[in-house]
From Swiss-Prot:
It holds the Pfam family CYSTM. One of its GO terms (cellular component) is plasma membrane. This is Protein CADMIUM TOLERANCE 3. It is found in: Cell membrane. It comes from Oryza sativa subsp. japonica. PANTHER family: CADMIUM TOLERANT 3, PROTEIN CYSTEINE-RICH TRANSMEMBRANE MODULE 2.
Length: 53
């Protein structure tokens, strides 16, 4: 028998997608912008999120 796969950490983009599914696009965009504001750089995930809105 095979062992089940190990639990994986949720990536940043997966986390944003989950927020988008749970709370909606506006909340996901604000969550993403706050993250980029805190780390002082624009990441690919921010650009993808802003383009989807």
């Amino acid at each position: 028998m095979y062992n089940p796969p190990a639990a994986q950490e949720m990536s940043y983009s997966d986390h944003v997608k989950k927020r988008h599914e749970d709370k909606g696009c506006l909340y996901a965009c604000l969550f993403t912008l706050c993250c980029c504001f805190c780390c002082y750089e624009t990441c690919e995930c921010c650009l993808e999120c802003l383009c989807c809105c």
